[in-house]
Swiss-Prot record:
Name of the molecule in the record: Co-chaperonin GroES
GO terms (BP aspect): chaperone cofactor-dependent protein refolding
Cell compartment(s), UniProt: Cytoplasm
Sequence similarity: Belongs to the GroES chaperonin family.
SUBUNIT field: Heptamer of 7 subunits arranged in a ring. Interacts with the chaperonin GroEL.
Domain of life: Bacteria
Signal peptide: none
UniProt xrefs under CDD domains: cpn10
Role noted for this protein: Together with the chaperonin GroEL, plays an essential role in assisting protein folding. The GroEL-GroES system forms a nano-cage that allows encapsulation of the non-native substrate proteins and provides a physical environment optimized to promote and accelerate protein folding. GroES binds to the apical surface of the GroEL ring, thereby capping the opening of the GroEL channel.
Main location: cytoplasm
UniProt KW keywords: Chaperone, Cytoplasm
Gene name of the record: groES
Lineage, highest ranks first: Bacteria, Pseudomonadati, Pseudomonadota, Alphaproteobacteria, Maricaulales
TM region positions: none
InterPro entries membership: Chaperonin_GroES, Chaperonin_GroES_sf, Chaprnonin_Cpn10_CS, GroES-like_sf
Length: 95
């Protein structure tokens, strides 16, 4: 199944953090926080402005992004956990 977000929404796959620290300590799953970094999988057609015109999004599929801790709605598509969020929830694009 394919999924295409609408308007100014973005579909994001979280980037998993390392399970071992630099010092070699293994972090159990129960102690891990969900990462706030992800990769854009798909984007909507753009934000609709007040005059009815469409503003294209600043991000594109494949961009690596940072987002807020409570951003987005979790969904599962084809067994893969993803997030749907508005472009305004994205804090920035990593270079």
């Amino acid at each position: 199944m394919t999924f295409r977000p609408l308007h100014d929404r973005v579909l994001v796959k979280r980037v998993e953090e390392e399970s071992t620290t630099k010092g070699g300590i293994i972090i159990p799953d129960t102690a891990k926080e969900k990462p706030q970094e992800g990769e854009v999988v798909a984007i909507g057609g753009g934000a609709i402005k007040e005059d009815g015109s469409v503003r294209p999004l600043d991000v594109k599929a494949g961009d690596r992004i940072l987002f807020g801790k409570w951003s987005g709605t979790e969904v599962t598509v084809d067994g893969v956990e993803l997030l749907i969020m508005k472009e305004s929830d994205i804090l920035g694009v990593m270079a």
